[in-house]
Every structure is written in C-alpha cells, then in structure tokens.
C-alpha cells in the first residue's frame, strides 16, 4: 500500500480523507516534446517524489529496470508509464498513456504523449482534453522541430498554459547560460503562437528530481517555483466558469410521463435555476426549472458537471441540440472555416463526403477547399490540393445542415469536431472551428442520395478508365 495515503487515512479517518479528496480541483495536463527528451521519466519522477507509487509497483520497477532499463543502477522511472512491450523494448512512447495522482492541493490526470513525428496524431488526441501543456526540451539539443510541432498543436487545440521544462540540466552542469539561451530561443518562436498563452520555464533534471517536486540546490540562480508547484498554482477553473453557457444535449431522459429532462455535461459557463435559455438550432425559449443530479437537485451548476436539466416549457429538444443563455448570439451556419489535423493514411479528399460530429450532433459534410497547409516546423503556410497524414491545414467545410458552433478558442466542446470515414467508420481527422462563415448557396443533395455519391466516388477511384463524372460537382 502507499504509506503516505495510509498515514493520512490514519490521522483524519477514511470519510474525512475521501471528502477532502472529493473537493480538490482536477487539472489535466500533458507532457510533450521531441523524442527522448525525458517525458516518461519526468512523469515517473513526479509520481515517485510525490509518494504516489505503491510498494509493489516500486519493487516491480526495480526488477524491470535490470531487464530493460536505460538508467544504469538507478530505477528507470519511465517504465511506470511506458506499458507497451514495444515501448519498453525501444525505450520510446508510442501510445498516449494516462496516469492519475494527487497532492494536498489538487488532483491531476497526466497524458504522456509520443514524441516521434509519425505519432503526432496520438499527441493531438492527448492534447484535446488538457488544460496545461508541459513541453520538455533536452538541454543538450535545444529547441527542435518536434518541440515547435507540439507547441503549435497544443496552441491550436486551445491550451492556454505552457510550462516549458528544460530537462537534463545535469548533463550540461546546470549551466545558467545554456538555460537562458534555450529560453530566449523558445520565447522568440512562441511569439508566432496564440497571444493568450501563459508561458513559464523551469530548469530540471527528471532523472535526479532537481526542481521537479522541490527546488534544487544545483540551480541557485533559478528564482522560480518547482514544476509541481507551478502545476498546483495554475488557475484554469475561473476561465471555464467565466465563459458563455453551453450545454450540448447528449440524451433525452423520459422515464415516465411526468419527467422530461435533457442530460449532458456543461461545456462551459454557469447555469442556475430560473435562468432563461434557448435551444439551438430551433431558437425556442424557456426557463430552467430544475438541475437534477444523482445526489439531488442543485441550485446552480458549472463547467464540467454532468447534469440533467428540466425546463418549464415543453419545447422540442433532441440529442445533438445545444442549450445556451437566452441572450447569447450563437451563429447557425452550413459553412465553417476550420483548422483540420488529418489522422488517416489516405489523404483528405476535397469534395468527398464525411460524417462530421460536433459535441453530440452528427451530420454530413465535406471539405470544399483547403486555403493553406501549415509547415509546423516553422509555421510557414503553403498551398496544397490535399492533406496528408499528420498534415494541418485551414479548410472550408460545408455541412448538409446548419448547426450552432463557437470558435474553438472560446469553447472546445462546441467548437471542435471529428471527421469520420462513412465507409469504414474510422475517425480520420479532427477540426477546430475558427469561425462560422456566411452561408453561401448550400449544396443540395436532393438529386442524389448519400449512397449514390459514395458509390460514384468508389467507381472513380477503382475504375478510373471508365471516365465517370464526379456527380458531387453536378449538384446545384
């Protein structure tokens, strides 16, 4: 058992311990950066030095370190996170690994993301739910292409707090000039990113624990806080609660004739009993009657809470609709301008129809044009006709029906969407809405069914010698 937890339970009792634990805020953060920068070792060190490893786990790490470890006589703490056999054999991270730990001030969920370029889509998946990005830089190598790539993706996915951990300082003798040089280079690059990002830098050694949980005597010139202290002090809850109210409906709960509730998780903002709201896309108004949870009714609820809302009026609301404040002006549009991260081996095809899923809403749409692709090593843009695997581009998306969306930077849940291949049902891309465009003439699919359009696309792909016309371009 974990001796620290055992001691705390003995001191205050199990009920008091659980109650104290329940009321801590939860922070989700990811570690990212170039390959072999020490991401998994850093997470292992955080867990070890904050006393979050059980005795049997620690014993197993010592045993495994003798077989596949890379740290000599010291325990290889990266093995706490690198669970796949292929990861341990190669000494790299492939999948996104999640770990949980807590301190006296806060609970944490860590996403350890891969550094290799071919796993960039895995990194984007891990970043999509995080509040903070811990970006590791090897003090010997400095800022690399993958460092810039991950910083850009984290910025694109709406993360507003960066902690740049300059790792392996022990290998450069904890040299202040080396730290300063890397800091200046990174901050110069970061000027091209979102201007709302808060960036803090910390020198550390994940292998030996310097400046990870507590400040190190090796860096008397560093006047900031340790990594753990920085994570504990990040103020992100207030940002979520101060946003406009957004409630995507996931399920209509009607257990009997006397109850009709709308279940889901609040994407952003606050809601109180008595608030005037409207349902989108219908635009019909009503008033919040009850906020129902498993533990009883609440007078108010905030971002991240799973609740069921009941209204005073019987209005038509279905799964995929969004409930917002009555005075919020949320655009309804068929046309979106969005940044798309492509995650499939086959490139994105302009004009091809895909399933588009926004929050709980599923519809059909296509990319009608790619304005540019981003070279994420230097953030330069260039024109292209398609997006390859791991490519990121600014695209014009046309949907078959008007939906309510926000800019992704304002609301992740109602501004983000996934793209699904209609034939294989595989998620092939992720999109972040920049803005809803003024509706152009909406493509009508009345002349051809979705099956006919997909069948036509297959014929043109596999039997090009038939010279079949693209019927999607004939629709008017």
Curated annotation (Swiss-Prot):
Its EC number is 2.7.7.4. PROSITE patterns: G_TR_1, G_TR_2. Keywords: ATP-binding, GTP-binding, Nucleotide-binding, Nucleotidyltransferase, Transferase. GO terms for molecular function: ATP binding; GTP binding; GTPase activity; guanosine tetraphosphate binding; sulfate adenylyltransferase (ATP) activity. Signal peptide: none annotated. Residues 33-40 are annotated as: G1. Residues 205-207 are annotated as: G5. Residues 24-241 form the tr-type G domain. It comes from the Bacteria. One of its GO terms (biological process) is hydrogen sulfide biosynthetic process. Pathway: Sulfur metabolism; hydrogen sulfide biosynthesis; sulfite from sulfate: step 1/3. It catalyses: sulfate + ATP + H(+) = adenosine 5'-phosphosulfate + diphosphate. GTP binds at residues 33-40, 112-116, 167-170. Residues 167-170 are annotated as: G4. With CysD forms the ATP sulfurylase (ATPS) that catalyzes the adenylation of sulfate producing adenosine 5'-phosphosulfate (APS) and diphosphate, the first enzymatic step in sulfur assimilation pathway. APS synthesis involves the formation of a high-energy phosphoric-sulfuric acid anhydride bond driven by GTP hydrolysis by CysN coupled to ATP hydrolysis by CysD. PANTHER family: TRANSLATION FACTOR. Heterodimer composed of CysD, the smaller subunit, and CysN. This is Sulfate adenylyltransferase subunit 1. It comes from Photobacterium profundum (strain SS9).
